[in-house]
Amino acid sequence: MTEKRMKILHVLTDRNIGGAGRWLLYYLKYHNREKFAVKVVLPHDSLQVAAVQALDVPVLAMEEMEDKSFDRKAFKALAKIFRAERPDIVHTHASMTARMAARRARVPYIFNTK
């Protein structure tokens, strides 16, 4: 019997590759692909997009995302993504907007790291 993979969405608002971005790339390179189905939500113009795709990890690139404390447009777009993707976990990297959108979309587990 095949075990269902846990769906995890990581959300980064950074356009450059900083500390969180480097950590995420390391994680994506070595995570267990048999147990975890991982996707990453990024601003469409982030330098991270190509780096994540090079690791054969799906990217959901958003035009609406800004790197600020609360972003109404991004909130609506993220909630829509979370409802469509139905992740088991949303892991945000310092984004209050993503945490609030995940809660609105009733994501079971929401983690945040800075």
Regions inferred by a protein language model and the residue ranges of each:
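Short His-centered aromatic/hydrophobic patch
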Residues: 91-97, 114
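Short glycine-rich, flexible loops that bind phosphorylated cofactors or substrates
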Residues: 69, 97-99
